[in-house]
């Protein structure tokens, strides 16, 4: 069992308080978690900062996910490795505990991903203290409760090859097991610049993201030294979306921590996006 690492810091440690925080995030965004069956998206990008800063931005993606799937697919959550621990591409087979209960791991699907990939390891060390995947779970639990099934992948080796390997392995596993899969890329955008500077720098990456141009997105991150911490997970989502027939991304919300704190001199930027099918 993977125990919470950031409950009480990134989000409330008590069930009632966490539920209230999620409700507040949705209220600020003017959204609801209303189940539908549109099945019109293949992947999403969500931020992973403290809920008080980025929860309301994440709400945009999770509202669309709820509207797309009344029956949950397997959620493959790919997050960057901030701690440096464990395998460079680490897939967890554990169930994950949160204040809202146990998020069950789809161990069969995870093992199939490892079989279908070439560089993906079964490894728990990378996940032990990592927050980028953990903070996604309460929103998903709020939508799907005990029906939720997850496959967490912590990505330390962020490049085109690893991103493609994950995406292609997920698609192959989905086909072999005849199970619907959905990739959530966990990432914040530019860190610790003014809001104006962050928006200017992120615009280059967001343009490539919208056009589903993986090569251009990676080029902009490297060429401009963009501090998008989860660019590898985003590349995985982009490649998977393209494999599933998507031709663009839809930016649902772009904001920064200054929109909450009032300090626009040094911010962290956040983005919610989805990849529409067709």
Q: PLM features: what roles do these ranges have?
A:
Residues 268-272:
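Short hydrophobic/aromatic beta-strand or adjacent loop that forms the aromatic wall/cage
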Residues 1-248, 252-265, 276-278:
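Active-site histidine-anchored catalytic micro-motif
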